[in-house]
Amino acid sequence: MSKLCRKYSPLLSLVLTTFVLFGCELEEVTVVEVDEVVIAEIYLDVSTDPAGNIARAFLHRTVGVGGVDTLPSLTESTVTMTRTDGYSFVLTGEATDECLESSPLEEPGACFVSELPVASIGPGDIVEVLVELPSGGRITGASRVPGSFKINSIPSLCVLAPNTLMTVTWSSSSEAWAYLNETSIRGLPEALRGSGIDVTDDPLYLLGLSISDSDTTVIFPSEFGIFNRFTSGYADLARRLQAGLPLGVTAEVSVTAVDRNYVNWARGGNFNPSGQVRVPSLSGDGTGVFGTTVGRSFDVLVSNDSSGLPACPLS
């Protein structure tokens, strides 16, 4: 799984500001004092190789009328994960860019990471998390890591002919509520040079989604990128990918089983005109999510020459 990412839209801020200043005239303004709320976004990712397991926790908060200067730093918090058999480890404080790419928040928050101790956590384990805040408050939650699964009949590296689609299937993961299908494609700008299709990102990251625990089939690459299709300039590339990948590119493909907590926090619920409403899985003196995932991946080389490598199965 990739780092947690928060994106802030200056355009949205401008629209809201313009609406307030010019869209209406208010005769009376009531200021409501907003309490400080700590938000914890905690994820534990289990990979094929236990050495690749990682846990991340990002703590931030809504700021009340007192402002951040009146509050103890969240970097003084302690984040502990405990398996039901008593095995326990504490996450280590790290720079915030280990948890997210950028932050629009007045207070950037606090990031905690653990890698080596997480190697002992496996699919199906029940893990509890405890966040101890510098104020003395506690935030708690628990998750059962999705069960083990495998990608069917695809080796860790395979060769795919140009302009060819391949069917990716996998076994079901118990406790999974959905699957994230991701790919990172390298070499597209050069491979499509002169085709009239402009690609600026290299690698190009595309995301697909299987929305239930039994939805275990996806077509590569045509069914990846469902969240990119409304991105400016992506339409031509999306049509091109319906026929497969061009000669010379490489791709990393992954399927990640995600738990109930992850799905509820990501999807929120039904459409809300006022914005996304997230469903938390943490409680106590704060709110947030404790999500667990299990990932599987393989690499694809697009070529007419196998060079002794196994061919990617097409179905």
Please describe what each predicted stretch is.
Residues C24-S315:
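A sequence/structural signal for flexible, mid-protein segments enriched
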Residues S2-L12:
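Bacterial N-terminal signal peptides that target proteins for export
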